[in-house]
Amino acid sequence: YMDVFRDWIKENKDNILDELNSRIFMQDWEKYASGNISSWEMEVLCFYYHDHELSNVNTAKYGLVNFFSLPEEPVIEKTFKKGASLIPIYKLNRICGTCIAKNKTKSVVYLLTTTGVVSVKFRQEYFSLFDRQTFRRNSDGTKTVIEKSWFNRGNMIVVQGIRRGDEFVTKKYASSGGHQLYHIDEVLTDGSLILRSERATGEEEDNGEN
């Protein structure tokens, strides 16, 4: 049987090598080259030379707006009285973009939208929650990272809140529904988004990236 097998390998050596090389190439491609030209540009250059990855998103479907078209001060939808004070309830808006930098001290993420860079301000505790990385502790004592910070360069997010001057401040009311932050896992060809509001489960630690 081994002689038959050896003869078959000898006769088909070139085809076998071509098939093997093709499979190795595809495995490496899937591992290292997932995404598109725009995502590669962001990963390597930190800017888009071609179209923004989110340029074809169905903005109407997700209620996404252009930050720079919003009034510089938030619009008051209604007010309610709390003691002697009148508390405003603001109209909330959503924007989306690609994270290009962050300031841990100020709990700020710099978001490259399709119309420009926006400074997005989070509450400190909320920022810290999504800036950490989750990991799994292995039996040999080593750690396997499950998910890094949502605010690392290249990650795409949707944020909900208000414009205040030159800054977008994330906000959510109990009555508003939804979340103030979503991670964009995938952009589909029809303009739909695969969104996620929860962190990947695992132990947490400081991300270690500025």
Residue ranges and their predicted role:
Residues 1-210:
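Noncatalytic, beta-rich nucleic-acid-contacting surfaces in large DNA/RNA-processing enzymes
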